[in-house]
């Protein structure tokens, strides 16, 4: 028996789930090796099996949660040298800098982790990105030492500004509380920050406004990284860079490139330039393969303008620390000395090296333009669904809607998150798949996803798993819309306590009850043309949370420009009062009934949770 508290067990369960990628309740050798590799730890298959064997009490070749807890108990009782190797691996995945006190510990005293290297990198990035922001001039630049960064995040203003830097116009800054900041107004900013982060695809399931106000370091670090990463990755796609077509391998199509996560695209881009420079070296990761600085030296020389003064003298230096210094000197000549210190290169700090390379691509892609390549741009609806899915923490992160869902696994994950207990994991085919039969396994997953939808009374007439596998856009969007609606309705139903599912008509009736009580004109439904002005939404927000809408900001001319301003105001104000809104201002102006439904439903949730 272990003597951990309930809170500690909950924390360990979260760690366990980080390893247990397929959710089968066991950590396999493959899963352990995969996550250690992601964290920059080079381990062989034999080493991984030995780690597991050391703690696998029932001898089945994997680690269940009970065994996991026993390992952590041993680690607590022994010194680091005497702890099982697996326990050390868990700590490495967690991070390297444990912090105590209110900023990083739970009430039970469980310590959380973050690395000073990350903190310094994020601070430098923020200081540069937001240097000209007049609202932040009193707190920038943020010093790198101590907890000053977390204190700077206290009132929500800094992270809201960072979100707008990553994805411009996410937040209507007219709604930010910038002056006379009491506890209530600070909390409003933090609620706006969290709901806006969700809207751009951040997974903030376990973060509340109070965590940010209290300066809980590990949570602020995690959110900051997600925001920065989304901003760095936002333009690394075929829509913004059709010249990425040049990264295709022989026999591949554009579809093959769309399947790749951004990390893989960046590795291809890196290797493309290594090959163009005549180097035989190739990188397969952002950790071990870049430690000696050789590949960085070649890459920087290859992508640099000829007059930038970038050179390759680092290759003549045997000392790796000095080589890394040279790399960053060259990066500085390109205006790209971001995220890394020399030791981050030498130690192969995966996360920061990934950010460094992404920033290099964004500033100096150095790819020749291509002609006659048809690029289908992501629609607003597709992006909204993608951000919603990612905000729920689906794994892997969805970069392309149809490539990300065609094997059925993400859809099944969504059903599992929206309707806990619905999914029978024994019916799910998890990768890796054998070459023979892989297609059938994926189609079986898609068929199971469709069956789950039917079990939830979704309208799926004429849709089967093969449609999803074939990336039929119309049918895939139909399923995703019903999942999004199901998510909103399931929360509403739970809050109502009636056990009776909330219908669309109920949401219209509630909306009109709010408008009527406020003496405002009612709507005929979610297609009502008056919604295009944004005013009915602002009226409902004001009815739910009196005083939240500044009447001086509401435009009444009915012009397209004023309507859009009102829509932006409505979306950000709704998020500020606690609504999780994925609808965009354009959805309001164009009166997209599906998105309008979710917005009013989210406002009803706010009223129920008062």
UniProtKB/Swiss-Prot annotation:
Residues 116-232, 260-365, 379-488, 501-608 form the Calponin-homology (CH) domain. Gene3D superfamilies: Calponin-like domain, EF-hand. GO terms for molecular function: actin filament binding; calcium ion binding. Residues 7-42, 43-78 form the EF-hand domain. The keyword Repeat applies. It comes from the Eukaryota. PANTHER family: FI19014P1 (PTHR19961:SF18), FIMBRIN/PLASTIN (PTHR19961). This is Fimbrin.
């Amino acid at each position: 028996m272990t003597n951990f508290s309930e809170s500690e067990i909950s924390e360990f369960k979260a760690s366990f789930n980080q390893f247990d990628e397929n959710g089968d309740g066991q950590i396999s050798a493959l899963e352990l090796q995969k996550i250690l590799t992601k964290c920059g730890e080079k381990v062989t298959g034999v080493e991984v099996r030995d780690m597991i064997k050391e703690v696998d009490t029932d001898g089945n070749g994997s680690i269940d949660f009970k065994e996991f807890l026993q390992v952590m108990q041993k680690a607590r009782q022994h010194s680091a040298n005497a702890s099982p190797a697996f326990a050390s691996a868990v700590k490495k995945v967690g991070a390297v800098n444990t912090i105590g006190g209110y900023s990083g510990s739970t009430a039970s005293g469980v310590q959380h982790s973050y690395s000073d290297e990350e903190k310094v990198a994020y601070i430098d990035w923020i200081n540069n990105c937001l240097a000209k922001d007049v609202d932040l001039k009193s707190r920038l630049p943020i010093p790198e030492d101590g907890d000053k960064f977390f204190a700077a995040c206290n009132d929500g203003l800094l992270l809201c500004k960072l979100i707008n830097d990553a994805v411009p116009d996410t937040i209507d800054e007219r709604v930010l509380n910038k002056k006379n900041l009491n506890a209530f107004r600070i909390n409003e900013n933090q609620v706006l920050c969290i709901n806006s982060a969700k809207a751009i695809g951040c997974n903030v399931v376990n973060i509340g406004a109070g965590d940010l106000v209290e300066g809980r370091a590990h949570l602020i670090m995690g959110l900051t990284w997600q925001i920065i990463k989304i901003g760095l990755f936002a333009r690394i796609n075929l829509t913004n860079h059709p010249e990425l077509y040049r990264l295709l391998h022989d026999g591949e199509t554009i579809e093959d490139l769309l399947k790749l996560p951004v990390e893989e695209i960046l590795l291809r881009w890196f290797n493309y330039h290594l090959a163009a420079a005549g180097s035989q070296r190739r990188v397969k990761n952002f950790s071990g393969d870049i430690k000696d600085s050789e590949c960085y030296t070649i890459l920087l020389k290859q992508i640099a303008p000829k007059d930038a003064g970038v050179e390759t003298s680092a290759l003549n230096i045997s000392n790796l620390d000095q080589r890394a210094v040279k790399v960053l000197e060259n990066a500085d000549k390109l205006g790209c000395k971001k995220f890394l210190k020399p030791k981050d290169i030498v130690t192969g700090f995966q996360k920061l090296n990934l950010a460094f390379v992404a920033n290099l691509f964004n500033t100096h892609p150095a790819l020749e333009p291509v002609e006659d390549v048809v690029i289908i741009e992501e629609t607003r609806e597709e992006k909204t669904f993608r951000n919603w899915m990612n905000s729920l923490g689906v794994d892997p992160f969805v970069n392309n809607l149809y490539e990300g869902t065609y094997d059925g696994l993400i859809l099944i994950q969504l059903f599992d998150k929206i309707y806990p207990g619905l999914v029978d994991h024994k019916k799910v085919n998890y990768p890796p798949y054998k070459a023979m039969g892989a297609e059938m396994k994926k189609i079986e997953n898609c068929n199971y996803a469709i069956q789950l939808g039917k079990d939830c009374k979704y309208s799926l007439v004429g849709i089967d798993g093969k449609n999803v596998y074939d990336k039929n856009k119309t049918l895939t969007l139909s399923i995703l819309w019903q999942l999004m609606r199901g998510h909103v309705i399931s929360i509403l139903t739970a809050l109502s306590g009636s056990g009776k599912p909330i219908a669309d008509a109920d949401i219209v009736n509630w909306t009109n009850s709010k408008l009527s009580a406020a003496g405002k004109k009612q709507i005929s439904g979610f297609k009502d043309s008056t919604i295009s002005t944004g005013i009915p939404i602002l009226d409902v927000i004001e009815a739910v949370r009196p005083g939240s809408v500044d009447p001086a900001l509401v435009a009444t001319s009915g012009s397209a420009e004023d309507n859009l301003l009102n829509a932006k105001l409505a979306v950000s104000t709704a998020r500020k009062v606690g609504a999780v809104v994925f609808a965009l201002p354009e959805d309001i102006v164009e009166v997209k009934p599906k998105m309008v439904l979710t917005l009013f439903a989210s406002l009803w949730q706010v009223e129920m949770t008062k």
